[in-house]
Amino acid sequence: MLVWVADFLAQYFSIFSVFQYLTLRAILGVLTALLISLLVGPVMIRKLSYYQIGQAVRDDGPESHFSKAGTPTMGGALILVAIAVSTLLWADLTNRYVLITLGVTLLFGAIGWVDDWRKVVERNPKGLPARWKYFWQSVFGFGAAVLLFKTAHLPQETTLIVPFFKDITLALGVGFVLLTYFVIVGGSNAVNLTDGLDGLAIMPTVMVGGALAVFAYLSGHVKFAEYLHIPYLPGTGELVIFLGALVGAGLGFLWFNTYPAQVFMGDVGALALGAALGVVAVIVRQELVFFVMGGVFVMETVSVILQVASYKLTGRRIFRMAPLHHHFELKGWPEPRVIVRFWVITVVLVLVGLATLKIR
């Protein structure tokens, strides 16, 4: 929004032309979202506490979690507000990638909001029924996939890129829609499953989001893309603003979500952030790299799938409890140790993902 104002003023005052620089707007996007989170966070936490919008804790969960009962939740709404405001202020709102990504993020956040509202405010322990949650995730995920496919102008926009191999690609055709659907919906649910400990989900989300910003910037720059043998995708650079806002909002939220948490993000945050990472990974054609960098999310999801499958087929459990972070808690690991070690794993995996830019 402010880009338009700056463009107009630049006709009369040349200093405003600096706002045409993507890097400056990205920095401002990070700082804007960070400040919104830090300034609004305490007010939101007080309001959530006043209206008793607190986390319900499972009776069959780790005993160490019983003390978390009543901790304010639905704090993910703060993240979404910070991202939306910062993006609307600093991004080019004529860019289709920005609009699609922001739209998907807010729509998945709406699903999470309804689920949280039913659980916390209406005191319905089931929240939004799983079939309806998955239905709306499918509607929005499939809708985004079709929209990206129909608006694709270049062959590389629907081509699967294989990491570490510059000459191995796969033209997906309509298969792009199916892959996009699974990446968006899968990413959404994976982050949601990971969000079980204080700060466990938000920091990997910030790290993966920051890495995807690097891919978005380089893919949108013709010379860098050619040099690194990655697809040149005009317009993806503008996603750096959105991802910068995500990073800033996430860091601001972590200020209050770090152990011991003052607030939880809830489904409104987790579902939205996972979908955001997924849709960006698709746009910059780095789905497989996203799978690597988001390895913690993948591990958490696979642990649940294996646990359920094993119990149904054999009557036995593979893990003491799923998702995986609960397994380590029940093995005696203190919560901060689980969190930090999962962060360390994410740092390593993100570096591996970034290494694919050069190792081809």
Swiss-Prot record:
Keywords: Cell cycle, Cell division, Cell inner membrane, Cell membrane, Cell shape, Cell wall biogenesis/degradation, Magnesium, Membrane, Metal-binding, Peptidoglycan synthesis, Transferase, Transmembrane, Transmembrane helix. CDD domains: GT_MraY. It is a multi-pass membrane protein. Signal peptide: none annotated. The keyword Cell wall biogenesis/degradation applies. One of its GO terms (biological process) is cell wall organization. PROSITE patterns: MRAY_1 (PS01347), MRAY_2 (PS01348). Its main location: membrane. Coiled coil: none annotated. It catalyses: UDP-N-acetyl-alpha-D-muramoyl-L-alanyl-gamma-D-glutamyl-meso-2,6-diaminopimeloyl-D-alanyl-D-alanine + di-trans,octa-cis-undecaprenyl phosphate = di-trans,octa-cis-undecaprenyl diphospho-N-acetyl-alpha-D-muramoyl-L-alanyl-D-glutamyl-meso-2,6-diaminopimeloyl-D-alanyl-D-alanine + UMP. Pfam families: Glycos_transf_4, MraY_sig1. It is found in: Cell inner membrane. InterPro entries: Glycosyl_transferase_4, PNAcMuramoyl-5peptid_Trfase, PNAcMuramoyl-5peptid_Trfase_CS. The keyword Transmembrane helix applies. This is Phospho-N-acetylmuramoyl-pentapeptide-transferase. It comes from Hahella chejuensis (strain KCTC 2396). The gene is mraY.
